[in-house]
Amino acid sequence: MTKNYPTVSEDYKKAVEKCRRKLRGLIAEKNCAPIMVRLAWHSAGTFDCQSRTGGPFGTMRFDAEQAHGANSGIHIALRLLDPIREQFPTISFADFHQLAGVVAVEVTGGPDIPFHPGREDKPQPPPEGRLPDATKGCDHLRDVFAKQMGLSDKDIVALSGAHTLGRCHKDRSGFEGAWTSNPLIFDNSYFKELLSGEKEGLLQLVSDKALLDDPVFRPLVEKYAADEDAFFADYAEAHMKLSELGFADA
């Protein structure tokens, strides 16, 4: 989709770049990249392309959205970000939360993701129930990512690769464990682990294993496991698309 990005002031651009530097320091110091990616994703992943509601527009600042079942633990990310947020009151929450996700991928060795500022904060959160359910398979993934958000099959598989970061916590998601042996490094090991089968101590969700059973998804899993550069290129594109759902559409 063609984008028509809003014009932002030079002062705003400078604030964003200074904020980016502060975020790099925080995320590296606190080892909190995974939860920053989760914050950005869960903010953006509520977008519905039919009603044009939800999306990456700062509504995670509301207690009501933080209270959604899928967002358990998100308040930890927001609390970590508060000291930086206070330094940049002119930056929208929408831009701030998406920038944190972009920087988190970069700091952990992942691809550089283009970031375009200018998102406006929406006044109310979306309804609960729009984020993907880890206990469901390919049809559900396509319902959420393709029909609801408007993303492609390639985007679905590339974005799944961000599970290379972080781990599940029983008290937040009902699941426990990391997908890879080094959950603070962004690389293609998620796909390698997926193809090698289940291992003691590592996690594979129903929604992960479903990628292997689909005739479109599986070749992409195999491609990304064999070629990290290809994964990085497709991930950067998919992450940018996710972070801009409903934003600057021409």
From Swiss-Prot:
Q: Which lineage ranks, top first, belong to the organism behind this chain?
A: Eukaryota, Viridiplantae, Streptophyta, Embryophyta, Tracheophyta
Q: What's the family? A: Belongs to the peroxidase family. Ascorbate peroxidase subfamily.
Annotated Gene3D superfamilies: 1.10.520.10, Peroxidase, domain 2 (1.10.420.10)
Q: Where is this site: Transition state stabilizer?
A: 38
EC number(s) per entry:
1.11.1.11
Instruction: State the UniProt keywords alphabetically.
Output: Calcium, Cytoplasm, Heme, Hydrogen peroxide, Iron, Metal-binding, Oxidoreductase, Peroxidase, Phosphoprotein, Potassium
Q: What class of enzyme is it?
A: oxidoreductase
Q: Where in the cell is it found?
A: Cytoplasm
Return the protein name.
Answer: L-ascorbate peroxidase 1, cytosolic
- Which species is listed as the source? Arabidopsis thaliana
What does the record give as the reaction this protein catalyses?
Answer: L-ascorbate + H2O2 = L-dehydroascorbate + 2 H2O
Q: What does this protein do?
A: Plays a key role in hydrogen peroxide removal. Constitutes a central component of the reactive oxygen gene network.
- Residue numbers annotated as active site: 42
Residue positions annotated to bind heme b are: 163
User: Record's Pfam families?
Assistant: peroxidase
Per UniProt, the cofactor note for this protein states: Binds 1 heme b (iron(II)-protoporphyrin IX) group per subunit.
Against InterPro entries, the record matches this protein to: Ccp1-like, Haem_peroxidase, Haem_peroxidase_sf, Peroxidase_I, Peroxidases_AS, Peroxidases_heam-ligand_BS
- So which cofactors does this thing need? heme b
GO CC term, one of those recorded: extracellular region
